[in-house]
Amino acid sequence: MSFFSEFKEFAVKGNVIDLAVGVIIGGAFGKIVDSIVGDLIMPIVSKLFGGLDFSNYYVGLAGQAAGLPLAEAKKAGAVFAYGNFITVALNFAILAFIIFLMIKQINRLKKDEPAAPPAPPAEDIVLLREIRDALKK
């Protein structure tokens, strides 16, 4: 088998194509969920907590004056910028919850497929059972 025919066989298999479609749809879906979190949910969270913007929370490690914006504090020296981590962690928690709700809804809407009937036993198994039953008599 030539290299190209092997590659063609590999690339045309259903799993590879399914994976490619999943990656493309996942990328598009990620943008939708990012928009839901960033444009719809985070403004509500910010409003509930008095307009907090966690991204500017930091601890100055080089003796910066308190109250500087994060960008200026970084110019003045090293900072422990924990606020951005809080924002990303909160976004992740909201994102995970939204995805959980969506998957739960999708699973609820899926129709339960009836279980496949059990496969009949192989011929050798049937023969062995007949021999066993004959020996018991």
Curated annotation (Swiss-Prot):
Domain of life: Bacteria
Subcellular location: Cell inner membrane
Residues passing through the membrane, by range: 16-36, 83-103
Key words, A-Z: Cell inner membrane, Cell membrane, Ion channel, Ion transport, Membrane, Transmembrane, Transmembrane helix, Transport
Record's GO cellular component terms: plasma membrane
GO function term, MF aspect, one: mechanosensitive monoatomic ion channel activity
Membrane association type: Multi-pass membrane protein
Similarity comment: family membership: Belongs to the MscL family.
HAMAP family on file: MscL
General function of this protein: Channel that opens in response to stretch forces in the membrane lipid bilayer. May participate in the regulation of osmotic pressure changes within the cell.
Self-association state and partner proteins as the record states: Homopentamer.
Name of this protein: Large-conductance mechanosensitive channel
Source organism (scientific name): Methylibium petroleiphilum (strain ATCC BAA-1232 / LMG 22953 / PM1)
Gene that this polypeptide is encoded by: mscL
